[in-house]
Amino acid sequence: GSFHGNVWFDESYSVSIANNSFAEIWDIGSGDVHPVLFYWGLHVLESLFGQNLLVYRLFTIAGIFSLAMLGFTVIRRDFGWKAGVLFSFFSLFTPYLAYISVEIRMYSWVIFSVTLCALYAWRIACTLRSKNPREGDGSIEEGQNWWMSSAYDGDGCREWCGVPCRWWLVMFLSSLASAYLHYYGVLAASFINLYLLIFIIARAKKALSVFIAGAVIQVALYAPWLMVFKSQAGVVSGSYWANVSFPRTIVEWLFYPVYTSYVIFADTYGFGYVLILTVCAVVAAVSALYGLANWLRRFKQQNTGFKESLILADRVLAPSTLPAIWGVVLYASVFTAALVASIVMDSLIVYYRYLCVTIGPLLLAVSIWLSHVNSKVCVRGLLAAFLGVSIVNQVLFVQDAYSGKNEEPLDYLEETAKSNSRPLVLSSDIGVEGVTAVECENIKQTFLAWQPGNWAHAYQSYFPTLTSVKSWDAALDGYQGTFIVLGQTQTEGVPVDVRDLESRDDVEVTDMKTFYRPYERTWFTVATMVKNGN
């Protein structure tokens, strides 16, 4: 799904800001709500290949493929081939990851960097533990660690406090990259560093100097952006768009990896897709119940005299599954911190789209636990059901992404603008004009910057195609004749801008057409209006 030419608003922002210099990206990005490392990466590509959506999408896909490769490399070596293969499978076929992997945004790369950071922090902790054993740790052979499935031979590698220096460097660099890619990356990297610090203080104080040096360098390199963060936090607190809708928000938090918009609206594509998803759900439920029953029966036979709850706790908290606990704790920590921040800032920032930043450690947990399930029927059934949902999700995404309907409103806008000698084009909906500013660069457009905060500064990324005004009067002052108004609605209807302008005594609507745009699942309106008098 990377060869289509469509973008939605967030993607349009990535594309537009990449056309600026590194310094300009830093400045313009200060008005946005994300750090700028991803935009810098796009700017490098733009300098080499020009504004090329295919190149940008391949770049984002590379982030997910890098995540999948961790399964075949780091995870396979640390936790066994089963866990590695499962992790790669989930990285490539989790429906939501498949969707964002072709979206021109920073998520695929921040998921990779957070996961890489977490894995190497775990490696460092395990190595320090093996070299600083305590009574009660159990028998630890030289170079062997019971928290990992493989031993590491450090001969020939430069070490800092008994740990290969390259591991420290990978951990510190991926931590810094996470922070410069997304603010949830900041949260994840902070918790990873914090938990490693606690472990070092408790078990390997000799390594404290290395950790502190790395932490100080990270903070020093991130300090310039902290100046920007303060202003961005003010924007989020005062004018952020996200809000709670019960129970939808809770459902999104819990099930977003598989419960994508394509799965939710599968019935609008045909009953066959609903039937397939229903079969997948039944197969998953039956497989899970079969596996659980089989597991409890086997361990009750091996552990007579113990309660089932104690057996379950013993297996879930077994040493071999501690890395899975690490993944869940990290994910839960980020979620909790974001929830607390939302309460403090009185603005919802616990958005499922942001939670996916730490989905890598969560997938690691699932992969490790599944790798310890002995029932092949259970595992195969779960994976088959998961793959079925993923295929349906991808088929529907491709159907929407490559639909010719996506181009209809853009073509009509260009035709209307051309036939009216490039008139004034207005909208207060940046979701529409962000897209048209990228897709129809030859049409000058004007945006009504109504939002409080610093958003208008962020939208300078669309200059010179898009310019801003503070009111309709400012846009129409001294103007006479035909102009175009753009709008977007979730259901078919008249956009608010058209209604507002039509209510003026000096404005009338002469033509209006509405198009369904499958890629965004919204209705796109192009209205031709005339202003009489001065």
What feature does the model see in each segment?
Residues 1-128, 165-530:
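Membrane-proximal helix-loop-helix interfaces that form the catalytic/acceptor-binding platform
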Residues 532-534:
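Short, solvent-exposed mixed-charge patches
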Residues 127-165, 301-313:
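Intrinsically disordered, low-complexity terminal tails and inter-domain linkers enriched
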